[in-house]
Amino acid sequence: MTLVLKFLKRQRAVARCGAIILLACSASLSAEEDATEVFNFKVSLDNREVGWHRFVVQTEGDQLTVFSKAKMDFTVLLVKKVSYRHEATETWLGDCLQAFESETERNTKRVFMSGSMKDGDFYVNRNEEEVLVSDCVRTFAYWRPAWLDDEFLLNVETGKYTPVSLEVTDDRLTNMTKRVVGLPKTEIHLAYDNSGNWQTLESDLKIAGTLRYQRINESVGETDAKL
C-alpha cells in the first residue's frame, strides 16, 4: 500500500511539473506573438532637418494597431512657411485594415479622416459621406513591406485610394532591399535592412523639394500616452 501511495504522489508531481512547463511554453509563445515595434525617423527636406515622424506598431495575436505622429516646419520657395502636424491610428486584422482615424493640420487648416469595416466592406468617411473602398484595404504600411504589394493603397491622411505599382531590388553593396512605390505623379523610395526593417524613405515633393526619412535610434517627438 505504501508503494502504491508513493507511486501516485510521484505521478501527481510529474503532472504538476508538466502543467508548469506547458504554462511557461504558452507564455513564451504569447510573448512572441505580442510585440511592440518603434520606428523613429529624422525628417529632412533638401538635406535640411525639418522635423520628425514616429510610428509605434503593436501586435496582439492577429490584431495589429499602429500609432503615428509627425511634426515638421519648413519654408517653400524661401517665402511660404509651412507648419505640419499629423496623427493617425490604424487597426488591422491580419493584413486587412479594420479602421483608422487621422488628424492633419497644415498651418491653420485642420482635416479629420476616418474609415471602418461594415458588413464585410471598408468605408471611408469623406466630406460627411461614407465612400465604399474595397473588402480588404491596405494603407501605405511602410513598416510591413509585404503589404505594399497591392494594386491600390489607402492614404489615411487624405482618404484617397491610390493606384500604385511596386518594384523590389536587392542592393549587394549595402545589403539593403530597395522598394519603389510608384504613384500617378511621383515615386516613394524605401530601403530595408537584411532583416526587413524599414530604414529610409525618399520622395520628391512638388515645389517643396526632396523629402527624406532617416531612421534613428533615439526617441523623437513630445511625450504622448500612446506614442
Please provide the spans of the model-predicted regions.
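Solvent-exposed helix/loop surface patches that form functional interfaces
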Residues: 34-36, 98-208, 213, 220-226
